[in-house]
């Protein structure tokens, strides 16, 4: 008899470890529920793992949220940096980036809310780490992209 509920991460993961299964389960819960709040019992059920593993791998639920943010934002920063470094017209880079942003928010609709919560609710050192790893590199990439477009005569220079 087939189950009609969501698949357990442990049933769908090919070779993932428990840490990755917990991160993916948290991501699925946030996508399915359109929320950034989750309970450890729901996480445990979805991952098919003991909720004590959250403390083992992440220290607490906040640590899990930071690991999820690191996974998702790390990919974004890496991809944006690679795009800016490509040898192509700035307007094409912008077009590709906008498409990637749409794809990202379709795949991870919780990401912006999670990022804002982690910056707002984390200790100052953790908030600074998030800014240094993700927000500053994204801002720098945008500055470079716009500057390249202005130099190429494709974008107008404006005073924000």
Feature map (PLM): residue ranges:
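N-terminal intrinsically disordered/low-complexity leader segments
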Residues: 1-17, 28
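Generic hydrophobic, amphipathic alpha-helix propensity
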Residues: 18-27, 43, 68-72, 76, ...
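Helix-turn-helix
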Residues: 21, 29-63, 67
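Conserved hydrophobic residue
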Residues: 35-36, 151, 155
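Hydrophobic alpha-helical connector segments
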Residues: 67, 81-111
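Amphipathic alpha-helical packing segments from all-alpha helical-bundle domains
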Residues: 74-82, 107, 125-151
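Amphipathic alpha-helical segments used for helix-helix packing
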Residues: 107-126
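Hydrophobic alpha-helical segments that form the core
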Residues: 143, 156-160
């Amino acid at each position: 008899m087939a189950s009609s509920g969501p698949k357990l991460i442990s049933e769908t993961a090919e070779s993932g470890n428990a840490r990755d299964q917990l991160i993916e389960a948290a991501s699925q819960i946030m996508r399915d529920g359109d929320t950034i709040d989750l309970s450890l019992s729901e996480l445990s059920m979805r991952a098919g793992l003991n909720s004590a593993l959250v403390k083992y791998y992440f220290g607490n639920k906040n640590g899990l949220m930071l690991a999820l943010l690191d996974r998702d934002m790390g990919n974004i920063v890496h991809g944006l940096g690679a795009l800016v470094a490509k040898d192509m017209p700035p307007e094409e880079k912008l077009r590709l980036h906008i498409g990637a942003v749409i794809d990202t928010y379709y795949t991870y609709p919780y990401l912006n809310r999670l990022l804002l919560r982690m910056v707002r609710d984390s200790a100052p050192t953790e908030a600074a780490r998030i800014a240094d790893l993700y927000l500053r590199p994204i801002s720098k990439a945008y500055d470079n992209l716009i500057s390249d477009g202005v130099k190429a005569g494709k974008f107008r220079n404006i005073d924000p």
